[in-house]
Amino acid sequence: MTMITNLKRSFTLENIRELAKYLKGFIPNIQDDETLLSFLDAMYTHDPDDNFDILYHGFMFRGISSNLLLQVENIDEMSYASWSKDIDVAIDFASKQYAWHQYLLIRYGWAIDLAKVKTIALNQFDAPTGLENYNPSREKEVIAPLIHSECVILDISGNNRKPVEDFEQSMRI
C-alpha cells in the first residue's frame, strides 16, 4: 500500500472541508461549492489521455505532461539551478495555458525549499518512468517531511510562498 493510498483514505469530509476553505482563499475562480467540488474531484482523477495525474505527481496543472519532470533522471545529482529551471518551465507553461489556475498546491515531488529538501523523487509512487535507482527508504526521508511540514501554496508568479498552516494538522497521516 502506497502512502498515496493511505493519504487518500485518510481524507475525511472534515479534512476536505478544511482544505476547501483554504483553497477558496487562494484560488479566485472558486466562488461556489460546485466549482470547488469539481476542483477537488480533479485532484483525485487520473486521465491517461491527458497525461495528467495530480495525485501521483503532486498537485499539478491539467494538461502539463508529467513527463516534463519525470524524464529527469538521477535527481540527486542535479544542481539546484537545473532543478529550479525545470520547475520554472513547468510553472511558466501552466500560467500561459491555464491562466485561471492561480496557485499550485505543492506536495510530494514538488518541493519549494530545495536548499532544505535536497533529494526529490517524482515517481516514487507507481509512476511508469523516472528514477531507475529509486530507493524506497527515501520515502520516509524525503516524502514524509514534505507531507508533514513542507506543504506550501505557491503563487503562479513564483514570488509568493505561503505555508499551509491552516490545514497542516488535518493533512497529517
Model-predicted regions and their roles:
Residues 69-71:
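Short aromatic-glycine-(Arg/Gly/Cys) micro-motifs in beta-strand/loop hairpins
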Residues 1-55, 73-81, 85-173:
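Conserved NAD+-utilizing ADP-ribose enzyme module
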Residues 54-67:
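Short hydrophobic beta-strand segments
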